[in-house]
Regions:
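C-terminal and inter-domain tail/linker signature
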Residues: 1-172
Length: 172
């Protein structure tokens, strides 16, 4: 059972993500501390400090988060005393520029499935940081920018296995 504080953290995170998806920059920023940081780890996209995070959200994320057919499914959530970790399955068709995920890559029209882990820190009832992880090689393979032949790289299969652990493991 979550404590009152943990329930507030979850509600704030859900408000934050909802504002991102709705393209509401002011509400997105209102959920964050005065000195937040944001790091999309595989691409190092993000920002530091309120002005840096706001600029990143304005220019690259809010209202431009994913193509219109995006589907997200929460797989698991762990809530601690000052942090939350959300594991998410995401699928979309790469029909728009998604430069935080694929900087400099024009839309390919390819279907993408990915498992994402979001680590969210909280301080004084606000989000202090987000560290976001995914398998960039798998995404690049799915859109045709990386040939997985001979490499220890999978594509959509790795994301699907997060949803269904009974799927066969890859044997090397």
């Amino acid at each position: 059972m979550l404590s009152d504080k943990q329930q507030r953290m979850v509600a704030l995170f859900e408000k934050h993500v909802g504002a991102e998806m709705a393209g509401d920059l002011d509400t997105t920023m209102a959920t964050m501390s005065d000195a937040p940081h944001l790091n999309h780890v595989p691409t190092m996209a993000g920002g530091v400090g309120a002005a840096g995070v706001r600029a990143f959200y304005r220019d690259h994320l809010v209202g431009k988060f994913f193509p219109p057919d995006v589907k997200m499914q929460s797989v698991s959530r762990t809530v601690g005393e000052a942090s939350l970790v959300e594991e998410i399955y995401i699928s979309f068709t790469h029909t728009t520029v998604v430069d935080w995920l694929l900087p400099g890559v024009q839309p390919t029209g390819k279907k993408v499935e990915m498992a994402v882990a979001v680590v969210v820190g909280f301080k004084d009832d606000k989000i202090s940081h987000e560290h976001i992880y995914w398998d960039q090689a798998g995404v690049l393979a799915q859109i045709g920018l990386l040939d997985p032949k001979g490499l220890p790289v999978t594509g959509a299969e790795s994301a699907r296995k997060v949803l269904d652990p009974r799927l066969p493991a890859r044997v090397f």
